[in-house]
A protein has these predicted regions:
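Aromatic-lined carbohydrate-binding/catalytic grooves of carbohydrate-active enzymes
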Residues: 1-78, 87, 92
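Alpha-helix-loop-beta-strand connector modules within alpha/beta enzyme cores
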Residues: 4, 9-21, 116-135
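Secondary-structure transition into beta-strands, especially the periplasmic turns and strand N-termini
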Residues: 22-23, 84-87, 134-138
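Active-site-proximal loop/turn and secondary-structure-junction residues that shape catalytic pockets
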Residues: 29-35, 97-101, 144-148
């Protein structure tokens, strides 16, 4: 849900202002995560990956939703679908996932806990497949704490990967060169930043364009 205190007009207001400024609007989302103080957590505590009868370990004040659970898959798809269907002006989105799984237990798998990682990834791919099928023309970047989600299956559903949070142009040369041995150049997202200000702007732009 949109925080109306911060964004009184919601996402619609942002897309409208972006259009007035002559730029396209993109959104950065993290739909696999959940805040333990959220309404969703209060309604569905069984949707969260966490070990029962043990102290819960948090990462960045978040927990991970159990994508091995089909109901959670439907919810995550619904979140993204709601954004894109209600706001067709959204021209791009970045899908991030910054938290490792710190409480390894799926309430939905019962005695099949050994399947958690495999079923989680399969559940994620099911969600991504549905999104890509419904919104094939929306460019999407996949990120996970940097480049932790660079894999061929994911590339079926995303336009590009975020290779690394390291945007130093000198270091980025090695990152992009190494990644190019496995993935096409057009799959590597790269930004021009002020990291390593000793380099001139043209060099940073040249590296970002690969």
């Amino acid at each position: 849900a949109v925080n109306r205190q911060k964004l009184p007009e919601g996402i619609a207001g942002l897309t409208r202002d972006a259009k007035k400024a002559g730029v396209k609007f993109g959104i950065w989302i993290e739909p696999e995560m959940i805040n333990p103080k959220s309404e969703l957590f209060e309604r569905h505590p069984d949707w969260v990956i966490r070990q029962p009868n043990r102290e819960t370990s948090y990462y960045r004040h978040q927990l991970v939703l159990d994508l091995a659970n089909p109901a959670v898959q439907d919810h995550v798809f619904g979140v993204v679908d709601s954004i894109l269907s209600h706001h067709p002006e959204v021209a791009y989105f970045k899908w991030d996932c910054n938290s490792p799984i710190t409480n390894v237990y799926s309430p939905s798998l019962g005695e099949r806990q050994g399947n958690l990682y495999v079923d989680y990834v399969r559940g994620l791919y099911k969600v991504l497949q549905r999104i890509a099928a419904k919104y094939p023309r929306v460019p999407m970047m996949l990120c996970s704490g940097g480049g932790a989600r660079c894999d061929y299956e994911a590339l079926r559903y995303f336009t590009e990967f975020w290779c690394s949070d390291d945007t130093d142009p000198y270091e980025r040369i090695y990152i992009q060169w190494s990644l190019s041995k496995f993935f096409p150049l057009k799959a590597m997202a790269s930004h021009v930043t002020d990291w390593n200000k000793k380099t001139d702007l043209k060099f940073r732009i040249d590296v970002a364009f690969g």
